[in-house]
Amino acid sequence: QIVSDFRISIGIGILKNMFHITAVDLYGNTLYTNTIPFPYSNTPDYYKQVTDKIKEFIATNQYDEEKILGVSIATQGITSPDHSTVLYGNIMNNTGMILEDFSRYLPYPCYLEHDSKSAAFLELWKHPELDSAVVFLLNRNLGGAIITNHQIHQGSSMHSGTIEHICINPDGPLCY
């Protein structure tokens, strides 16, 4: 049997006015979570403060550095195929956010992903029998991801599943 907390992963969910930090074990169980009110700002000071809070979270929960597998950062925005940059992020005004803004301050491997696709990864992890699904992420802004053949469908330009931009009423208000 695997010792569930022999290694842990840290998940960061960045929203417009706050961010969440979560520690999960090798089975995907949540160990600790914290929500920090902190408005997003594309500034070096923002990234430094967020990464300082991540390090503080790890220290407060008494995790040795060698236990940390990595840090996954989920945000509202379409990421590049190599997961290094937010290519389109009008909800939070985070177009151009780069993974290196976080990783330069953290001694762990880091990964950047669209928040809806991160939710779909969790569904696949928790439900290995899941073959095809549409995942809806319901928060202030609707999001979605498509799972086919046990894979998250990316689409030709990483836009697959971004149902938040489906036009329901052409005469209605604009998204942003």
PLM region spans:
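Glycine-rich phosphate-binding loop and adjoining helix at the ATP-binding site
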Residues: 34-132
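Hydrophobic "anchor" residues
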Residues: 30, 85-86, 152-153
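Glycine/GP-enriched mid-protein hinge/lid loop-to-helix segment characteristic of carbohydrate kinases
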Residues: 33, 108-176
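Gly/Thr-rich phosphate-binding beta-strand-loop-beta motif of the actin/hexokinase/Hsp70
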Residues: 2-33, 134-148
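Acidic surface patches and DE-rich sequence motifs
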Residues: 25, 80, 169
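Hydrophobic residues in beta-strands and at strand termini
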Residues: 2-4, 38, 75, 138, ...
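Active-site/binding-pocket entry motifs
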Residues: 20, 77-79, 172
